Amino acid sequence: MRVLVLAVMAIVLSGTAARAADPRYPDWPCTQAKVPEISLAAVWAGPPLDEVQSKWKDHAKISALVAKLSARKTPLDEAEKLVKEFLAASASDKTANAKLLFAGLFDTLNAQRSQVINGLERVSRKQREAADKIREETLALQALQGVTPRDDAKIEALSNELIWKTRIFEDRHKVVRFVCEVPTTIDQRLFALGRVIQQEME
């Protein structure tokens, strides 16, 4: 039973030790630096988008294409091909359509990214609460083990509960590590599609 207690504490401590690497973002659980939103200048070197940034939603065809290109289930090579086909068919409207398309991608992917970041921070707060609870129950288990006479039924019940809560904690921790990659993947997708759009404009 002592081995169980030590194992539980090791798992909980390893799952929470890396949090708050940046004091500005105490709920950020990832080893990757938190970048709250993508800078337009970092992904777009084309003509200014000021006059089109709020207009892309008015174009049904562009809105539908933005939705398809933004979906992570659409492979990047397929998305790049769709961009090229759309702009090749745009003829004299190519520059205007290119700007509208990128404005839509920028808005949509930035919004997706914000949702992922907010979700990660929500889970991080839940994990912190779960870790505190597991620590409390581990101390309670240790106290029970030192009581004479021993209440073996109560010790077993609390041990089983700790095992269950620790398993959930571990599973969430693994999911968080996976989801931490998503904002970077979105950044890369936006940069790649922006580059293709700019190349097709030339």
Model-derived regions: residue spans:
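Bacterial N-terminal signal peptides
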Residues: 5-15
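N-terminal Sec/ER secretory leader and immediately downstream segment
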Residues: 19-94
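Short, charge-rich amphipathic alpha-helices with coiled-coil/heptad character
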Residues: 88-117
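Non-transmembrane amphipathic alpha-helical segments
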Residues: 116, 123, 127-145
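Short E/K-rich amphipathic alpha-helical oligomerization segments
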Residues: 136-164
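Alpha-helical oligomerization segments
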Residues: 153-202
